[in-house]
Structures are given as C-alpha cells and as structure tokens.
C-alpha cells in the first residue's frame, strides 16, 4: 500500500521590490506499506473531495488533453514535437508494469540524500507596462540544501522532503517559496498501488534527450484521488486535479521527464495555468552501492489573475546525508 499526503499551496503574501510575491509549492509525504504487494489497491485515511465539491467545480466534466486530436494535443504540449503517434493501446499495460517495477526497486534502495538547490523566480513585466530593457518586475535567486529522508520501518517506508538554510528548515521569513517541494518523489505517481487514481493513454514514441522513449499521457480521476492537490488562498482552500505527460526510457523504463498541468483552468479563483516540468537523471552517489534516479531540474510556470510567474529549481551535488549528533557532558 502506498498513500500520499500531497498539498500544493498558492498563497498571496507580501510585496517584494514592487511586485506581489506568490508562494507556490507542495508538501509531500509518501508512506509505503511493506506488507502489501506492489500491485495492491491502496487503502488509507481518505481525504477525497466531497461529492458536492466535485459537482460544484469545473473538473467534474473535464476532458483531458490526451483525448483531443493530435494537433490540439501538441498545441497544449509543445514538447511532443516529433512524436510518432501510437496506433494501438496494446503496449500500455506492459509499459506501466515495467515502469512500476522500477519505482518499486528505487523505493527499496533510496537512502537519505541531500543536494544543492538553486531556485530562480521570475515575474515577467505585463505587456501593458510597455517595452523596456528589463523584461522582469522581479527576479529572486536563492540557494538551499535539499534533503530527502527515507525512513524504513516494519510498517512501511516514508519519504520526507525538506529545504534547509544553514542547517535549519527554510521558512517564509528567510526564503521565498519554501513550500515548493515534493519533486524528488513525484515518480511515485506510477507506483503500482497509485495507478488507480489516474487514467493513462499510450501516446507513442519519440526521441527525448538522446533517448528513445515511450510517451504516456495521464489524467487524475477526481473521485479516486485520496489526497488531491489543494490551493490555499486567503480564507479559502480549493482542490486541484492534474493531467500530464511522462516520457519513459524504452531501454530501462525509467522516467526521463514529466509534465503536469491543471486538469482544467480555474477562472473562478483566477488560476489560469499551473505547469510543472521535471527532468530526471541518473545520480551516482559514493557509498550508496548503486545509482539512483532523481530530479536534475524542475520548472514551474503559473498564471494567477494578472501575473505570470516562472520558478526554476536546479539540483546538483547529490550525496548521502548522515545526521550528526554531539554528546555533551552532563551539567553539574
């Protein structure tokens, strides 16, 4: 059994250097039950949206973009340029099963790791402000240590992610967007026990980053998602459901890239777009015993009311994390 507590947060905060600061991100906690088979149906404390919530929101009758004609799909996802469209859905189950096996294997081996993270947030200047040499209202660059803890117990495995500044958890008082996290475990979306929360479509084959890849589309099923992403606005919290595309290496069935979009825009709250693109890569860590598969870069773009914002996360120098403890003599 795998269950996930996953919250994306969009919150208006302060004004920084003349532009409104937007904190966007996710808090992610994965729990994997060692006693359940990898393909078992998930069971967990439910946090599903209510029936009234589903009926009152636009995703109730949402049509994923992978159901649209191919030219429209490619317009939604420009990264699909060069895709050879699938003529059959027969390979879908095989691809999902093999990719799921990779998730199970990685989860069993992943240790506590830490990396360097560079975060750049850009707020482009709206067109109404005219042409100028500086195309951005605000630019902010920050550096962190990004920590992924893998806790193996008799009841299961739990993945927790933290952003650190000088050895302490980052907070909004010291860093912009401290909630933008959750990327290193995003591949668990296709863990066998999680597949029932989404619909999948085999889209075809493509060359991506010099790899031959299988391309899959996915869309969350609102009534099946136990812990939907939720956007938090002043005095209001709304559920958000996602669709996307994943590019899976045809040689070893590891995810090379993932793209996630809103299942439908939310004009009722001013959220027109929220797109996350994750690029994964092989990471060789000394003393880890084998290679891992972790994010190299994450790009988030969103349009909220009148602002368009882009945030880029780059990860490097992955290494084992070992907590240090210091024994102090007893005070007389």
Model regions: which residues?
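Structured extracytoplasmic
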Residues: 30, 35, 39-243, 250-257, ...
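Sec-dependent N-terminal signal peptides
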Residues: 1-31
